[in-house]
Amino acid sequence: MAKVMQKYLQKGNYGGKEYIKEETIQKFNTCYFCKEGNRRGVGFDKPQLGTEGPTCGCVSLTSFGHTGFTGGMTWADPDKEIVYVFLSNRTFPDSNASNKLSKENIRENIQKVIYESIIE
């Protein structure tokens, strides 16, 4: 996952090879309906527009990523040159299990610690 996100961070390039055109990454990462209150791009989720959202609130507006049903999260921040990958399986042993990841903001809190440790 980290390599995939790094490829997106590098505008479609990885290891000296172009896998996706830069224009495609740009289109995926554009928030077309932010004015209407929808923070999602075509291919990626974007940072929250208010106080609620998928990130710690410390990421740049150019950042992008995805949170998954099983609790995983990937996020890339071009301005800060950071890739964050959180893998989990909150659905094990069943999908009705408690959702502590969301309720306690575990992914977002880890992301915040990473930003505070590296950036500040």
Task: Report each predicted region and the residues it spans.
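Catalytic loop of the DD-peptidase/beta-lactamase superfamily, centered on the K-T-G motif
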Residues: 1-120
